């Protein structure tokens, strides 16, 4: 019968190798097992052979395997990169110094001193005063709605008027008065409509 012997690598990935039982007992030459990428020669064992212990689950070993692989790759790649790094770092240092020198005068040009700024207040430039030619402060305009005067004679009438009072103002016709009858209110609302033309053919 053939038995399975698990050869565990150092990086944690279980490798399987099928070896005949009779081949081990008879000593059929040296068998080569690959461990960690290196070939090792192992002499055949004589005597009673035992089954290898069961391997751990692949998930846990796989995690360890990837970590070990990454460390192996970093160890392998560290050798040739060590020679290139000093020249690259020197280039970086020169670039950094050039950038630092160029950035200092650029900041002065981009941001002038704050003392040279004039504070801007929009209210300083907005004046709501009329010019002296059109001053109307001497007119009694309290309570007067906005009016557009076309002629000078209307302006003279305004000068002759006294201060406006709500008692003397006539009431508009659409305001309802409690003393008026409904018929009088309706008479104020009557509007003459054009006559109806019945001659139009439909």
UniProtKB/Swiss-Prot annotation:
Organism of origin: Homo sapiens (Human)
Signal peptide range in chain numbering: none
This protein's encoding gene: PTTG1
Record-level GO BP terms: cell division; chromosome organization; DNA repair; homologous chromosome segregation; spermatogenesis
Modified residues (Phosphoserine): 165
Intracellular or extracellular location(s): Cytoplasm; Nucleus
Family listed: Belongs to the securin family.
Short motif D-box, span: 61-64
Record-given protein name: Securin
């Amino acid at each position: 019968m053939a038995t399975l012997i698990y050869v565990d690598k150092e990086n944690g990935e279980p490798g399987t190798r099928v070896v005949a039982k009779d081949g081990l007992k008879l000593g059929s030459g040296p068998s080569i097992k690959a461990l960690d990428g290196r070939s090792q020669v192992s002499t055949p064992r004589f005597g009673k052979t035992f089954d290898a212990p069961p391997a751990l689950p692949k998930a846990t070993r796989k995690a360890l395997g990837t970590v070990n692989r990454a460390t192996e790759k970093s160890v392998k790649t560290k050798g040739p990169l060590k020679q290139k790094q000093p020249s690259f770092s020197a280039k970086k240092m020169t670039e950094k110094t050039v950038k630092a020198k160029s950035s200092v005068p650029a900041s002065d040009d981009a941001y002038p001193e704050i003392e040279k700024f004039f504070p801007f207040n929009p209210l300083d430039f907005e004046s709501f005063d009329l010019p002296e030619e059109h001053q109307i402060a001497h007119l009694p305009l309290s309570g007067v709605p906005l009016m557009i005067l076309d002629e000078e004679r209307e302006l003279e009438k305004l000068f002759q008027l006294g201060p406006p009072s709500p008692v003397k103002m006539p009431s508009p016709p659409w305001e309802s008065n409690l003393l008026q009858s409904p018929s009088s209110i309706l008479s104020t609302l009557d509007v003459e409509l054009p006559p109806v033309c019945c001659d139009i053919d439909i």
